[in-house]
């Protein structure tokens, strides 16, 4: 039986010891899949002692059903349910703390409360609080009628539950949850932000609401992370800011990542990937080499944890971990 910690404890312990550890992010299985693929992804890296593992939360998507008469119906279906369940399965199997993601989109405050109760019962004492993206049938993000519009509201709800306060206010409480709350930060500014300064003020609101640490969106230029941390500190944000890295694995990333995440691809990395042509193996090597370079510089700067975005493909993370950690 492993000792239950929370992510903030883990980050602070690494800081106190002067070491850098790594964490990574997995997707829950597609509906109909079992746990094998997720466990294999963890098996690839477990020997390098990950600090913790994140598991993403996915909204519903549109699915078409064709009737016998040829007419089509569209339904909202979650293709990747099971975030809480697979998080508990990983934590129980490996004794590594797991951080389920929880989003605002598509959920009422009561849905969120029920999910948090399940997490608490299962020994999941960490959560990453996110607004989430627009639903498949939405042009822009629309909150549930009984839900939250912004991540800061979700943070407030989780922090309130830690104090024994529930949505309906009618519970005779004798047990308080103790979630460590993470939130997202954007070194290159959230797409919906009015300005970089406003974006940092929104982050400060999340911290003041109860967030314990920040995980950044992916970046490929460490200078942008260091500048972001400086600006956050100047704004009075003192919690740990964990850098997020993603190894490039496809030439398409040169186009899709900036378009989707407003992420800058440095010219040196772009040239290295373009020089690989359509050779997928060479592209992966270039992505690994760049991530190793980034991780070594971040480690030298004393960051306590580096978070890797993986899409559940962890073979390259194992190679990076072997080289850096």
Model features per residue range: what roles?
Residues 1-24, 31, 166-179, 325:
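N-terminal amphipathic alpha-helix/helix-capping segment at the start of soluble metabolic enzymes
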Residues 4, 132, 145-176, 183-192, ...:
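Active-site pocket-lining/capping segments in soluble small-molecule metabolic enzymes
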Residues 21-39, 97-110, 180-198, 274-289:
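Active-site mouth loops of central-metabolism enzymes
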Residues 25, 53, 119, 206, ...:
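Conserved, mostly hydrophobic/aromatic
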Residues 29, 48-81, 135-146, 211-228, ...:
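Glycine-rich, proline-tolerant flexible connector loops at the mouths of alpha/beta enzymes
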Residues 108-121, 198-202, 227-230, 250-256, ...:
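Catalytic cores of alpha/beta
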Residues 109-157:
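Flexible, glycine-rich active-site loops centered on histidine and acidic residues
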């Amino acid at each position: 039986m492993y000792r239950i910690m929370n992510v903030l404890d883990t980050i602070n312990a690494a800081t106190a010891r002067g070491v850098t550890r790594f964490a990574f992010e997995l997707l829950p299985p597609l509906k109909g899949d079992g746990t094998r693929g997720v466990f294999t992804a963890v098996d690839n890296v477990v020997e390098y002692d990950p600090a913790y593992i994140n598991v993403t939360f996915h909204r519903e998507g549109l699915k078409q059903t064709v009737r016998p008469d040829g007419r089509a119906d569209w339904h909202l279906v979650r293709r990747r349910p099971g975030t809480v369940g697979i998080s508990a399965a990983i934590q129980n199997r490996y004794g590594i703390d797991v951080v389920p993601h929880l989003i605002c989109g598509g959920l009422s405050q009561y849905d969120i409360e029920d999910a948090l109760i399940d997490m608490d019962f299962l020994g999941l004492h960490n959560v990453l609080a996110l607004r989430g993206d627009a639903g498949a049938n939405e042009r822009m993000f629309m909150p549930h009628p009984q839900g939250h519009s912004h991540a800061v509201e979700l943070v407030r709800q989780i922090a309130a539950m830690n104090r024994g306060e529930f949505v309906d206010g009618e519970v005779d409480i004798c047990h308080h949850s103790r979630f460590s709350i993470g939130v997202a930060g954007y070194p290159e500014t959230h797409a919906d932000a009015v300005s970089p300064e406003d974006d940092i003020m929104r982050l400060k609101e999340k911290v003041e609401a109860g967030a314990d640490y920040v995980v950044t969106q992916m970046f490929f230029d460490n200078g942008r992370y260091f500048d972001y941390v400086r600006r956050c500190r100047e704004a009075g944000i003192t919690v740990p800011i964990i850098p997020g890295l993603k190894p490039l694995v496809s030439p398409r990333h040169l186009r899709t990542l900036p378009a989707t995440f407003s992420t800058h691809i440095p010219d040196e990395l772009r040239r290295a990937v373009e020089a690989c042509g359509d050779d997928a193996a060479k592209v992966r090597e270039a992505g690994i080499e760049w991530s190793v370079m980034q991780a070594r510089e971040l480690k030298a700067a004393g960051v306590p944890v580096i978070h890797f975005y993986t899409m559940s493909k962890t073979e390259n993370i194992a190679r990076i971990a072997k080289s850096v950690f």
